[in-house]
């Protein structure tokens, strides 16, 4: 049994017009060219366009798949960044994200003025959706991870009905929004983002953690335009393989569908899907229904447009190798094989890791708490269903 959640965005027309005006005003004042003008050049020579897109149309439905069976909890060492956070010192401003059993709000520290993303989860809904273990896993994993391309988590709180995760506010919004607005990215743009993702995956895998939910919706842009991987609800520490199906249908690896067990290879498969989607504007395996998407993945009918860069095509084919033992990134040299691929030959990996490469997109921001790059949501005035003491006990150590 699986859960399919559908997420559609549709902000008011005035907000869309406002964002379009911001886009053209900022673009006209920039001396750099637009995103479509970026050609196959070295990452260090990327043109930088500063803008805000309309982030709301043509969503692919965001089908999220997660098997109901709970997974075995794997303990991780936890070193909280800050233990002095409390909800009382945060002013909750506006909702910037919404999910099946929770939402994300922009919050401001009343003392320092700093802005944070506050993830609010309704305990009853988490339990009803049988996501208890995934929520615990996300907290434990995020508190362990410290990397420039991964969103930071600072602390957690709870009250009688909700769980809270105090996280880094990433003001650029989702990569998904920019990709849908521009329809596709140039070869060099896709390579820039892929190189930062490779660094993040290398780090995660070195800790024995599999991400399992790589997709444009989970990739945020920092104020400078660098990648920030978010939403680690499906992340898991693995010693061998796991058998739970989780992720987005378009991005599921064949071994996940076959239930033969999967490991970090699913992240490399997802990277292949992501590179293809960035350059084409849609994932390679498509269908009108989830079943049709699964059939396309299993049949592995991989087609490329004629304009697809040959080196990128070669890498995508190797990332989308059905035999996971032969998939690039999964063999003896691991991530190094990916980094040594000819598509990345112009990438200076040290410069990439240390944020010395200029991003091709710099989000438009007018002040530190600017939420113009996010969708608009109705505020929750009810707080959601009340939970029982039995539900609360599941999060006694939160």
UniProtKB/Swiss-Prot annotation:
Entries under SMART domains matching the protein: S_TK_X, S_TKc
EC numbers for this chain: 2.7.11.11
Principal EC category: transferase
GO cellular component, one term: cytosol
InterPro entries hit by this protein: AGC-kinase_C, Kinase-like_dom_sf, Prot_kinase_dom, Protein_kinase_ATP_BS, Ser/Thr_kinase_AS
Listed GO MF terms: ATP binding; cAMP-dependent protein kinase activity; protein serine kinase activity
Keyword set, alphabetical order: ATP-binding, cAMP, Kinase, Nucleotide-binding, Serine/threonine-protein kinase, Transferase
SUPFAM superfamilies: Protein kinase-like (PK-like)
Organism of derivation: Caenorhabditis elegans
Any one Gene Ontology BP term: cell adhesion
Pfam families, A to Z: Pkinase
UniProt-annotated binding residues for ATP: 96-104, 119
Protein name as catalogued: cAMP-dependent protein kinase, catalytic subunit-like
Coiled-coil annotated residue ranges, if any: none
Residues of the AGC-kinase C-terminal domain: 345-398
Residues forming the catalytic site: 213 (proton acceptor)
Family: Belongs to the protein kinase superfamily. Ser/Thr protein kinase family. cAMP subfamily.
Catalytic activity reported: L-seryl-[protein] + ATP = O-phospho-L-seryl-[protein] + ADP + H(+); L-threonyl-[protein] + ATP = O-phospho-L-threonyl-[protein] + ADP + H(+)
Protein kinase domain ranges (all copies): 90-344
Protein origin, superkingdom: Eukaryota
PANTHER family recorded: CAMP-DEPENDENT PROTEIN KINASE CATALYTIC SUBUNIT PRKX (PTHR24353:SF37), CYCLIC NUCLEOTIDE-DEPENDENT PROTEIN KINASE (PTHR24353)
